[in-house]
Amino acid sequence: MAWRVLWNLSSCDAVKMTIIRDALSTLTNTVIVPHSGWNNSSFDDDHKIKFQTSLVLRNTTGCLRNLSSAGEEARKQMRSCEGLVDSLLYVIHTCVNTSDYDSKTVENCVCTLRNLSYRLELEVPQARLLGLSELDDLLGKESPSKDSEPSCWGKKKKKKKRTPQEDQWDGVGPIPGLSKSPKGVEMLWHPSVVKPYLTLLAESSNPATLEGSAGSLQNLSAGNWKFAAYIRAAVRKEKGLPILVELLRMDNDRVVSSVATALRNMALDVRNKELIGKYAMRDLVNRLPGGTGPSVLSDETMAAICCALHEVTSKNMENAKALADSGGIEKLVNITKGRGDRQVQGDGAQGSY
């Protein structure tokens, strides 16, 4: 009964941080960790298979889902809570392995992880980030340079460029500088997290789970940091792009919005951009007004699709031609004529509940 009370209280913004401060550690250590089965080999197989039906676990993950939407400080404290991220991901892995894709517990875990994946580039320690020039190296881009550069001390010799094996990863082979056995908060952005999210996107029929999984990939692939580049490559490696494209056809506004923004972020990777332009252009255009999509979409979702089209066609003539060939130009012009007093705001690169 106490867990239900906390679940109800956690929906009130005024007390969320109080619950996090006073009860998060207790909730994690007495419910989440033991009931998830993570780090507890004494649980028998029958418990591991049926744990997701636990009412206590369902209510507590629902409470965490609410708490994770309380803002930056809430996210930071939850990420640093020992065993929390590990247990939530363990629940998802176990449910995926037992083909339980649609339970409320899975939904709560996915939506909590989506929120904890929000703004990682800005909220994790600065030492983990890469600047734009380093990101160019990571993605294998050449930048003009000279062997030496002038400085106030004479000529400064250019640092030796790292080998491609040291600073690139395209989804194949070991990831440079990344732990093979991530723990805690590192599990949020480790490329191994991509596969369970994609499995849920392919198998779940729960719209909230689909939105949360797409939103997690959306958040993880946003921004100019190396792990976002790794996630984009991992999605391609796991053949996740066709899964995302198929969900564009779904008759659910919020799912389509998350998927469209995830595709926009995936297109920051040059190879992903080529694939999305080649195989997803018609699906994106079909969701614009006047297309053959199943329903009329909200302004927010339409903006997400427009942002995806912008990124996919940016600096890519073949994709721009595909947009024109699929009738996208006319539909975009009609949007501007019909809604001349409205503008698409921002790029929607990340989102949380």
Identify the function of each model-found stretch.
Residues 13, 229-230:
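Leucine-rich repeat
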Residues 43, 174-181:
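Short glycine/proline-rich turn/loop motifs
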Residues 134-135, 353:
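Extended, charge-rich alpha-helical scaffold/interaction domains
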Residues 1-10, 17-22, 26, 35-69, ...:
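Alpha-helical solenoid repeats of the armadillo/HEAT superfamily
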Residues 50, 180-203:
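Extended parallel coiled-coil rod domains
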